[in-house]
Amino acid sequence: MRVKTSAEWNGERDALLDGLRGFARIMKRRPFDNEQGLRGVSAFALYWFVRRTAPSVVFEVGVWRGFSTWLIEQAAPAAEVHCFDPLFMLQHLIPKRRIGKTYRSPRAQYSSQDFSCAPIRELVAGRADALAFFDDHQNKIPRLLQCKASGIKHVVFDDNMSETYTHRTLEHERAADAPLLEREIEAYETFPALWPVDFRSGGLHLKEAGIGFPVERELRDIHRDRNWHSYVTYVRLK
């Protein structure tokens, strides 16, 4: 398993900054301000990984209000998109004010099935560029193995932090059983903080030095949400 280093991320600094400026322009068209889930640099991280992979089909697991669906469509405008969330079965029972504004795409296929129960292999249909994105707060080793069984090699995980959280992350697994990940993963890239992060919530404390990006006028909205850092991680399976 090849883990991308801070030095390697710094080596891509010019490309990252250029991509971030383009992303800031795209964000002016966002359907709503995301108050939960992907925000700031973490939203850019998903956009960056999806755009770089250029998948023909994307599986989004954990949709909620749909902000990440919109991000995926901006990064891969020609991709087929399949969205999975039990919310779709329950949404009519939840007052709209509890959810807020939502984005539902006419391009996407929506399902209340769990990813593990859906016919993913048939939907992948041998496409080597298929990508899955998980923001579902479920343990990640089962998700990784489900992707492998379905023929998906490109996987992006949100909330891949080493601190105690709502689920077992890949960082937890790296600390506990690194050989398991070594057997399954070819490349492992956790998107860096672009600016300093110092975030506390209950017993959780996230602190990152960042890599010193400038705070340009067009980047201020993204910089404002810099503390919503969720360690978005791209994995390429063997």
For the regions a language model picked out, list residue spans one by one.
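S-adenosylmethionine/decaboxylated-SAM
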Residues: A43, Y47-K238
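N-terminal auxiliary segments of SAM/dcSAM-dependent transferases
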Residues: M1-G11
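Class I SAM-dependent methyltransferase Rossmann-like catalytic core
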Residues: E12-T53, W70
